[in-house]
Amino acid sequence: MHEQQLSDAEPPKPRTGVNLRGLAQVTIGVGALALVVMKADTRGLVNALEHTRVSYLPVAIVASFAVTWLMAYRWGTILAAKGVRFKTSRLFPYYLIGVFFTSFVPGGGVSGDIARLIYVDREVRDKALVLSTLVYERLIGVFTLLLIGLIATLMTRAYGQADPRIYVSEAVLAIAFAAILILMSGYVSARLARMIRFIGQRIRAVKVAEAAARTLEAVTELRRDWALLMKTAAISVVIRIVWSLGCFVVASAMGLPLDLLTVFAFISLIDLVRLMPISVGGLGVREWAVVVLFATVGINREQALTFSLLAFAPIYLNAIAGGVAYVFRARISA
């Protein structure tokens, strides 16, 4: 790969016009956040902030950037399995740009994935191949999230937390885990690819259907590589550990009565909510999830809201860094 090719890559262009789905996501996110803030006691929020040991928070910031770096490394590992080699240091800015789009542009994680797809495809010139690595990365990431979350939730209940909402959490994680296992099945993927091609012929969208089917088949090929599966799963476990430890540091800074297992379980559930394309970057919906889950262990709304703001603020620092990288690359290519 040539450095000049990267410099000349044009950044993804935002679409013009009214996006009703995006508008709905913004409205839901802002509305949900406004509602949870309005229901909170201002004095309680100030008190929670005043009793937070700010000196702990840089650790959470470092952890969040380390997670983004590890995600870029995982993606590079998947690309290398397809014969496309990128240094992690070159994928890292693309991942930051992806975080920027995910956090501030309607569309959820899809927006960030599209941004990364466009940048890397400028060099690879094979959208189906790059897309297959993104889909595989999503699957392995969600698989690990659900697995760790389910184990942590079961262990949390074993230690005596038997709130009915814990049982509901277990059911949600178990169902989602089973769904991911089915999607990762080669048997299911092969039949989905055939069905997509058939539908494409019927609705006269053969090219689009063929691209989607090729992507599914490429993902299936990646899944057959057991060495890659084990390596990316191990990286994903490390990512979950680092991210959850960063959140645990925030909980410790606030003096919240949360043990490490509970943080692992709760953060997995909250991240699952964040993945849903309900609001931009999970804004608002994420805060409600934190409030509901923390209530099961006796943490009040104000403390839960403060935790959410402090624990997820580092993601926005990643997003801002991604925005700077986006503008910088746009100026280079201008």
Where are these regions (language model features)?
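Transmembrane helix-loop-helix hairpins in multi-pass inner-membrane proteins
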Residues: 1-50, 101-205, 279, 283-334
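Helix-boundary and loop/linker segments of multi-pass membrane transporters
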Residues: 15-18, 46-53, 84-87, 123-124, ...
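Hydrophobic alpha-helical transmembrane segments
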Residues: 23-24, 57-61, 88-93, 167-172, ...
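Hydrophobic/aromatic residues in alpha-helical transmembrane segments
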Residues: 32, 71-78, 116, 243-250, ...
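Hydrophobic faces of transmembrane alpha-helices in multi-pass small-molecule transporters and flippases
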Residues: 57-61, 65, 95-101, 131, ...
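Membrane-embedded helical hairpins/re-entrant loop segments and their flanking transmembrane helices
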Residues: 72-97, 250-265
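Juxtamembrane inter-helical linkers in multi-pass membrane proteins
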Residues: 90, 94-100, 195-216
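Alpha-helical transmembrane segments and their immediate interhelical loop/hinge regions
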Residues: 208-253, 260
